[in-house]
Amino acid sequence: MLAAAFADSNSSSMNVSFAHLHFAGGYLPSDSQDWRTIIPALLVAVCLVGFVGNLCVIGILLHNAWKGKPSMIHSLILNLSLADLSLLLFSAPIRATAYSKSVWDLGWFVCKSSDWFIHTCMAAKSLTIVVVAKVCFMYASDPAKQVSIHNYTIWSVLVAIWTVASLLPLPEWFFSTIRHHEGVEMCLVDVPAVAEEFMSMFGKLYPLLAFGLPLFFASFYFWRAYDQCKKRGTKTQNLRNQIRSKQVTVMLLSIAIISALLWLPEWVAWLWVWHLKAAGPAPPQGFIALSQVLMFSISSANPLIFLVMSEEFREGLKGVWKWMITKKPPTVSESQETPAGNSEGLPDKVPSPESPASIPEKEKPSSPSSGKGKTEKAEIPILPDVEQFWHERDTVPSVQDNDPIPWEHEDQETGEGVK
């Protein structure tokens, strides 16, 4: 309904000569003041919600990684949140600014890089969801198995994702430029005659590579992972791991479904624009603008899904919030009491058993020189009876001290004495 209203206002207010132009960078000229106000306001609201949500998710993941070794799924979710945050920080404000103006005044570099950067982040998210689905299937196949993944493997996967994602939309960077049309400066996709066939092929393959195939493989792995979660384990520990695996699978599957549904209108508008015939109807600009808003709203929906559906993220959010509240700078009284308590805090740091310092002095074998030194240091007088007692004790053979059956020897000694 709102899109239809936008379409009516745009068709009546927009210059008919602009209909055949392929705009870029979010530039859509229109004389409708309502259209210029509502779309930027929606984008600002999406940015605020998504910014707070993604910061919470990133803070929780970094806090968990600081406490222990990061997992592959957590690293991929972190990559997803970073891509969302990048879109909300760098792309959505530019889109809102471009929508609010009838002339392009954001510069040549922003015109060339705007669409490329958006599609790079979106393709990176799409590829990340595929890898998440694969890892989720591996985890669901054997939840009790502890998989150790090196940091090198995690970094290699992330670098590969961003490299492929940045190369796929590269033609948009090449052919987006600023042009003057009827005295108005615009950001357009200007394809020369030599590259028309190549760009026609790009317009068909890019949606398949960035959206169609990743969605197919992600659905395949999520379906297999969910099928594995239906098999009940026999042991209590396996059942607990299986329940957790099912929760993770459902959460990540929800991320994939919501992302696909909110991204689908943008692909409809994109294909419509890229395959527009000379005499064919142009897509309504209200539909194009709303499809962009829905695409950016994915970045706000993802952190909400994580925080609502994952108990781990909710507990992590509580832990981070508690850590932020309880972490206060030491007061003057506490800083003055610290030196006095240092002597009591040192024994808590017990050295390792392998080190010589871990053996207390009272348990070390005493030598005559050390015993003499301690006696002289203490200056305690030795009585004659005590000295004779220790002298007789030292002269007793060590075999009797270590005799496991001393009662038999005592009987023998007693018998010899009677004889």
Curated annotation (Swiss-Prot):
Topological relation to the membrane, as annotated: Multi-pass membrane protein
Protein localization: Cell membrane
Region listing for Disordered, in residue ranges: 330-419
Pfam families linked to this entry: 7tm_1
Biological process per Gene Ontology, one example term: response to ischemia
SUPFAM superfamilies according to UniProt: Family A G protein-coupled receptor-like
Keyword Nucleotide-binding recorded: no
InterPro entries assigned: GPCR_Rhodpsn (IPR000276), GPCR_Rhodpsn_7TM (IPR017452)
GO cellular component terms attached to this protein's record: cholinergic synapse; plasma membrane; presynaptic membrane; synaptic vesicle membrane
Predominant location: membrane
Keywords in alphabetical order: Cell membrane, Disulfide bond, G-protein coupled receptor, Glycoprotein, Membrane, Receptor, Transducer, Transmembrane, Transmembrane helix
Expression by tissue: High expression in the spinal cord.
Disulfide bonds: C111-C187
Residue numbers on the Extracellular membrane side: 1-41, 93-116, 175-201, 274-286
Membrane-traversing stretches: 42-62, 72-92, 117-137, 154-174, 202-222, 253-273, 287-307
Molecular functions (GO terms): G protein-coupled receptor activity; identical protein binding
UniProt topological domain (Cytoplasmic) ranges: 63-71, 138-153, 223-252, 308-419
Composition skew (Acidic residues), residue ranges: 410-419
Membrane among keywords: yes
Protein family (similarity comment): Belongs to the G-protein coupled receptor 1 family.
Function field: Proton-sensing G-protein coupled receptor.
Protein name in the entry: G-protein coupled receptor 151
Organism listed in the record: Homo sapiens
Taxonomic lineage of the native organism: Eukaryota, Metazoa, Chordata, Craniata, Vertebrata
